């Protein structure tokens, strides 16, 4: 009887450790997706950045991205993020520095990002528009 009790305790500990590893992996995947999005904008790979965006509301459309070649992103920083476990989303704040190519003006913009996890595909997607850069 005593060994069954210890076996149950060990099993519970292992299961809770597995859940922690799964959540940690999920967090690592989110960070990788966020980095991909921001690096893609930085290096003018706008199609790659757009591929990260998938709206939960399928009626929503991505705005045209062809005007983005008028700016150059010079820096990006993930300022903070807040997870919402109820609907498996994370709201993050990113700060982008950029230059208007024609004028040479330097700007900064804060971008609120809503990330959601697709359980079927086991991937994170951005449910927000591209940053609202001043193009001219």
Where are these regions (language model features)?
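Short solvent-exposed beta->alpha transition segments
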Residues: 26, 31-33, 41-91
